């Protein structure tokens, strides 16, 4: 089993949870759940990079992904540490598609060894995040 907290410095983890609570109407429990899901997603995207899986998180988890990306220093350092010195690009698509990619991505994360908070992912199964098809990004 993989644990998202093992991939993020405790101080950075606490900071991202605080940023989520500052910017959104989330309590600490919800902010922690979201950041857990975001880290699981990002690490899986790194692990599966180049495989053409077209991973895409839903809008709910994407809130925490964007919060981390906007904390650029910490996101850059995380990419550097876990992606062999490279930077995991985020290239959102303009239009949303509804192709089942959110559900597929949650299963890829589970298959990669992370515990999936299915309720967070299921909320967006009928939707799609704005990830570019056929890109090596997230």
Q: For the regions a protein language model found, what residue spans apply to each?
A:
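Intrinsically disordered, low-complexity, repeat-rich regions
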Residues: 1-138
